[in-house]
């Protein structure tokens, strides 16, 4: 805990989110912008709010997020992971409910590397019989 802020780091794909929460009225600021301005897709907004809605803390915290790297989906997942960790830092009894929902576990799926002789990671060059 830093002052009256609770902190959590979240990661997803190549995105990293640093999340700070404190008691407030439910404002979420991502990289200096309101969340609805930063995330264009409704699904991204939904992903970010999931741990708050699960624990019934959607209107009780002001959240400040600094997120870098990745795309919109990766950043939304990283913010969700960071909010989950910050909530656990605030109240450890929330961990069981968040863990059961699958928000505590880091999603370890990463982009598979491109192989030599292939077009992409698994797409081979077209086979010619003759």
UniProtKB/Swiss-Prot annotation:
Entry GO CC: cytosolic small ribosomal subunit
A GO term, aspect molecular function: structural constituent of ribosome
Keywords recorded for this protein, A-Z: Ribonucleoprotein, Ribosomal protein
Keyword check for Metal-binding: no
Pfam families recorded: Ribosomal_S9
Any single biological process term in GO: translation
InterPro entries: Ribosomal_Su5_D2-typ_SF (IPR020568), Ribosomal_uS9 (IPR000754), Ribosomal_uS9_bac/plastid (IPR023035), Ribosomal_uS9_CS (IPR020574), Ribsml_uS5_D2-typ_fold_subgr (IPR014721)
Family of the protein in this entry: Belongs to the universal ribosomal protein uS9 family.
HAMAP family: Ribosomal_uS9_B
Protein name: Small ribosomal subunit protein uS9
Gene this protein is translated from: rpsI
